[in-house]
């Protein structure tokens, strides 16, 4: 038992990198763009942490170059959807009872990975899968998503603190308990923003909910890179 009231690091907005000629971030991004452009990624469904290759394959192409295939996506059917729901509900007891600061710590670590070693990878997948410029990708898939995970972790603390009743009558001690949903959250996310696509399922998870994430069919490469 921890006798403390944890407070996450004070969130700050992630600085936007410039990608100027000769800069480190530009060189890393160019390398990653070449790598991802030169391969066709086989993307499975992810169910209970396991890769599931269904064989029902749809090719993903660059929006700005329809002749360039960048991924082969294994689509989920009824069997896979039901398995994903069962897996989410199977994790409910463990995840919903985990201390909120432990859940927040997972996403704060993810934000640090994104701002460092995974930044070029995520930005490159957004550029290739959504036809965004390096600056658009940097603002969206890197900075905004980093900010979502940082600020949402602190917002969780605020929710747990601010919802406590301000007054307790004599001989009573009022308190409020914020509980996750009993079911699961089904997140159907848009094509145009990498950050929003990742934020919809993850903000629910920070608050103790389990879920099933269904990215829009046009941007599976970007979603897969974000998840992994």
Language-model-detected regions and their locations in the chain:
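A short hydrophobic/small-residue beta-strand
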Residues: 211-212
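Conserved coil-to-alpha-helix start sites within the AMP-binding
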Residues: 190-200
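Hydrophobic, small-residue-rich alpha-helical packing segments that form membrane-like cores
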Residues: 146, 150-175, 180-181
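Single conserved hydrophobic/aromatic residue that forms the stacking wall/gate
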Residues: 220, 224-228
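Glycine-rich loop-to-alpha-helix module at the N-terminal edge of alpha/beta enzyme cores
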Residues: 55, 60-61, 66-160
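Aromatic-residue-lined binding/catalytic grooves and analogous aromatic/hydrophobic interfacial grooves
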Residues: 187
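Conserved short alpha-helical elements in the N-terminal third of ANL/AMP-binding
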Residues: 200-207
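Hydrophobic face of amphipathic alpha-helices that form TPR/SEL1-like repeat modules
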Residues: 1-70
């Amino acid at each position: 038992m921890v006798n403390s009231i944890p407070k996450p690091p004070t969130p700050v907005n992630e600085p936007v990198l410039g990608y100027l000629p000769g800069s480190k971030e530009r060189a890393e991004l160019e390398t990653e763009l070449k790598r991802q452009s030169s391969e066709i990624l086989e993307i499975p469904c992810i169910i209970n942490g396991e890769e599931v290759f269904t064989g029902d394959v749809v090719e993903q192409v660059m929006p700005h170059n329809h002749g360039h295939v960048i991924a082969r996506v294994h689509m989920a059917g009824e069997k896979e959807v039901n398995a994903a729901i069962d897996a989410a509900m199977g994790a409910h007891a463990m995840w919903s009872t985990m201390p909120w600061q432990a859940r927040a710590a997972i996403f704060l670590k993810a934000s640090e990975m994104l701002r460092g070693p995974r930044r070029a990878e995520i930005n490159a997948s957004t550029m290739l899968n959504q036809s965004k410029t390096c600056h658009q990708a940097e603002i969206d898939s890197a900075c905004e998503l980093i900010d979502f995970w940082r600020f949402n972790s602190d917002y969780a603390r605020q929710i747990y603190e601010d919802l406590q009743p301000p007054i307790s009558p004599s001989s009573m001690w009022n308190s409020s308990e914020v509980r996750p949903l009993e079911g699961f959250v089904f997140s159907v996310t848009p094509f145009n923003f990498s950050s929003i696509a990742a934020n919809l399922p993850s903000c629910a998870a920070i608050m103790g909910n389990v879920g099933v994430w269904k990215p829009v069919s046009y941007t599976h490469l970007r979603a897969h890179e974000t998840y992994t």
